[in-house]
Amino acid sequence: MTAMDRLDHVSNQLAAKRQKKNPEGKPFRITVVGSGNWGSTIAKVVAENAKELPEEFHQIVKMWVFEEEVDGRKLTEIINTDHENVKYLPDVKLPDNIVAIPDIVDACADADIIIFNIPHQFLPKILAQLKGKVNPKARAISCLKGLEVTKDGCKLLSNYITEELGIYCGALSGANLAPEVARQKWSETTVAYRIPQDFRGEGKDVDQSVIRNLFHRPYFHVRVIDDVAGVSLSGALKNVIAMAAGFVEGLGWGDNAKSAVMRIGLVEMIKFAHMFFEDCQSTTFTHESAGVADIITTCAGGRNVRVGRYMAEHKVSGFEAEKVLLNGQSCQGLHTTREVYELLAAKNVIDEFPLFKATYQIIYEGLPMEKLPELLEASED
């Protein structure tokens, strides 16, 4: 028995001991909304747990897929027949209990737990289709990386989901590059989930132990905390920092420069969090995978740093780089940078966030990347 086999065996024994038995005899039904590389990866994780915990989770995990054709075949057909998302997560076998569904309402109608995992700019359209058509007792987890921003302030996407659908929503974020998680390379993540005010009782409703059982794997360790705002903001703002890290990497400035960007970015992230969400906990950013660990990982190899690097190396726009590099997927940092800048400018506090400001100016106003150190130094005078 290999070390990983032993780890699997011990993990399965522990999971069996803590498995919640629904007194109504109805395991929780799971739906994943989204089938990009991270959506497909999370579907793989929860489908594996559904198989191992049949008294707690329904054996079938539904995954909503935006239908498209790949080499003349529908993507849902490929996933359901070949058990592989050949476009967004190639060369990774998916569990056969994942069922790809092209209709969003059909995918979510009877779900007890809905996991949202789509580019955040598509969320309003998705929620409009689901409004009034989901189980009113369902719970949700947002894996989205972004904010709902207006000139008056910003809203967590988890709160936006709650307001639109009337169901409680937590958040998942961490140092999780999807290809590594999908290939079962060990990592950890943070799930923020508070017990809902209308909690119906242990075994009848989703509590923190159910959430941990749903996501925790021997290769994907889960810490469940209460700070939904902190986890959500970390997942969104780290992408802005990663864009800037990509700039300095593409310019060939080395690891010292990238570390400086990451340090300044972490400071601005915490300042932003406390400015708009007073109940955020600073330890979320410094102690959890969703905080500094996610910044490090995202700046080392995520799609946002790749886009920023390509912009610097090839002197192209962010959206050109996105098109070349991401195979139809979204670079969230491009959108979040604009949203954060517009909010801070409307509040007349943009100069308190020099890295966020400079990143916006580079992407959207053509500011030379080489001016980044000068702008950051001037802000400290």
Swiss-Prot record:
The top EC class, named as a word, is oxidoreductase
Write down the EC number.
1.1.1.8
Catalytic activities? sn-glycerol 3-phosphate + NAD(+) = dihydroxyacetone phosphate + NADH + H(+)
* Any Gene Ontology biological process: glycerol-3-phosphate catabolic process
Query: Oxidoreductase among the record's keywords?
Result: yes
The similarity annotation says: Belongs to the NAD-dependent glycerol-3-phosphate dehydrogenase family.
What name has this protein been given in UniProt? Glycerol-3-phosphate dehydrogenase [NAD(+)]
Gene designation per UniProt: GPD
